[in-house]
Amino acid sequence: MNEKEKIMKKTILYYLLPFAFYLMPFLGYAQSFQWIKDGGSAENLGSNDYEQVYSIATDSQKNVYVLSKVGMSNLNVDGNPKTNYDNPSSFPTDIVLASFSCDGTYRWSKIIGGSGTENISSVQVDSQDNVYVAGRIASCDNGSVSQPYPGRIENDYTFSNASNACSLIFLAKFDTNGVFQYIKRPQLPTTSSNAITYTASFNFQIQDDILYWFVWLPPGTYADGAFTNSTSETHAPYVLKYNLDGSFIEATQLGNIQGIFSIIVNYYRNPNNGFYYMTFAKTSSTTFTINGQPVVNAAALVCYDNNGNLLWKRENTQAMAGSLVIYSLDFDPQNNIYIGGKIAGAAIDSFMGFTASFSSPAFVMKLDATADNLLWASHHSTVATSGYGALVYNGNEIAFTGWCAGTNFTWGTQSIYVTATNEGQDVLLARFDSTTGSCLSLHNITSTVGSTDRGTAITVDASGDYLVGGGFAALIYDTNGNSVTNEGGTTDFFIAKFATEPCSPLSNETFETNTIKVYPNPARNVLTVAINENTNYELYTITGQLVKQGKLTTIDNTIAVQDLSKGYYLLRIGNENGNWQSIKVLKE
């Protein structure tokens, strides 16, 4: 070993040994549910809605942000009273955006509400830890005596609308402390029919600090005249792109859709190749076509290239509504596609050649980049966990959350005792090898007898720990014996951390001196190094292997990392005088 290699080994040990805790998930140390927080009201929501987390985001400091529908009576978040702004006479339902710190301490929350049921699709965080939500308020109420429940974001913003001049979709930004920054409403005031019937908001993502917002829009002019939808259809799918400051970049149309239909739709962008994906599931036997191609069966996965051109469509084989539901998608650097969902049992349905032998089990699946080949798929082998779920890719593994029950809940080679027979269900966290699909472990959140609980959202924080969110019916416990209790109604929402300790040390601290700053960290595709002089760089694995090196200037100051395996790296930056500084970075 030469002298430079010896120095690098010492440097890597110096920087990484103090952070051994955040490497524990990769070294086999036991993880468990370290803390649980909750919120909700004391009533049921209407139309089969539930108080349950459906979107989670985390930032560089491992603060947590969640979205959930909430009711009115005794509404609170972790004991902090909140106000519902809906009409109290008919199943009042609003949305809460809530934030908790790394150790679960309550930080702040916002109620987004008004008359009707809002659709706020997801919460996202940028590289500077600002927080964004996008979605649609429910009505054109103007705040008058006869329409006293206008859309609003607490006391930050009230939507000005009227039945003949209505605009419902919006994008809002807050800083990390919940301070309102701006709102964007790309649709010009239009008729209530256009705003309510033909305008929809779906998923919303931030990748490399660009905002991608998936919407359906009727013909008209949008984004202060920046683009026009001139389709002859009643509405067309678009992805709207924005900079972090709210300036509009462009709109890309994702083909055409025809028909008014009852379907569950979501959109995703693969950050590695820039392609767009749509999942849908019919809820009734309705007519639905994509680019003039009829959708015959109950569900499908659809792919568009980065210009919005339809590439392919993969359907299931059963026309019965609800026979296949896709909960979520994720992607790896090779553009393989991971799917979590449920499928009808008794082999009456098939998707990509995959079938199930018993009633509607949850499944996880891996397809190649073009969805021509099923690489692996599996479902649990005992009845449970249909109806709800979510999936996330985490390097060498896939994590899935849903629900489980019974004395011997089994998935692959793994089994756990959950509950006695017919004594309720618990939240499930299942982990799988992303290469082989083998089940690595099963975990449940302990609850009182008879409780009906489920996981409905999952993400990974900067330490590689999992955040699991969902709904619970009675009382649930973390591994330290702390519990949260349902206020009343069918469910309250919860957020829980699965880790080796309540707040693992940061694995993605942004290194900053007077001259250097690295962002985003963690990164998927590109690391940007903010410097004021020319420098050299070297990028090492945690075992000391040099994987990249080169020069950076104040103009050309980015490092491509999209081809690297997910995990932790040591970035060394050296100036022309030979002074070197080392920075920990995380590749997502």
Give the location of each predicted region:
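Short beta-strand-initiation
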Residues: 18, 51, 199, 324, ...
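Bacterial Sec-dependent N-terminal signal peptides
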Residues: 1-35, 508, 512, 521, ...
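C-terminal outer-membrane/trafficking sorting elements
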Residues: 511-519, 523-588
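Short, intrinsically disordered/low-complexity patches at protein termini
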Residues: 18, 129, 335, 397, ...
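Intrinsic-disorder/low-complexity peptide segments enriched for small residues
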Residues: 6, 11-15, 21-25, 43, ...
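A sequence-level/structural motif corresponding to short, flexible coil/turn segments enriched
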Residues: 29-509
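Low-complexity, intrinsically disordered/propeptide-like segments
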Residues: 4, 16-30, 173, 220, ...
